[in-house]
Amino acid sequence: MYAVLVTGGKQYRVAQGETLRVEKLEVEAGNEIKFDTILMLGDSDGIKLGDALKGASVTAKVVAHGRADKVRIIKFRRRKHHMKRQGHRQHYTEIEITGIAGGDKK
């Protein structure tokens, strides 16, 4: 069984036992978190699809928090002797999917 969940403004296709990185969540490592905004559920019988499936949820365990590799940004204006360098490291939360519960379409 798999599901498509929404967190941090992004959609993720997940299955039980998978580990993935999502936008930073304010939950301590080792705690469980429940995602209620599920857009799709699928298994061998077919799929359930909707804006938000009523009663559907995905539970996950927070494994760790971290920061991604640095992305370097350079802004350059030709012939003006102007160059601006900047870097960015995005915070993330690593989660492990522990369960997927089905539901009815709203």
UniProtKB/Swiss-Prot annotation:
Signal peptide segment: none
A molecular-function term among this protein's GO annotations: structural constituent of ribosome
Taxonomy, superkingdom: Bacteria
Alphabetical keyword list: Ribonucleoprotein, Ribosomal protein, RNA-binding, rRNA-binding
GO biological process, one term: translation
Gene name for this UniProt entry: rplU
Family, per entry: Belongs to the bacterial ribosomal protein bL21 family.
Protein name stated in the entry: Large ribosomal subunit protein bL21
Oligomeric and partner information: Part of the 50S ribosomal subunit. Contacts protein L20.
Keyword flag RNA-binding: yes
GO cellular component: cytoplasm; ribonucleoprotein complex; ribosome
Record function comment: This protein binds to 23S rRNA in the presence of protein L20.
HAMAP family, sorted: Ribosomal_bL21
Pfam annotation, one family: Ribosomal_L21p
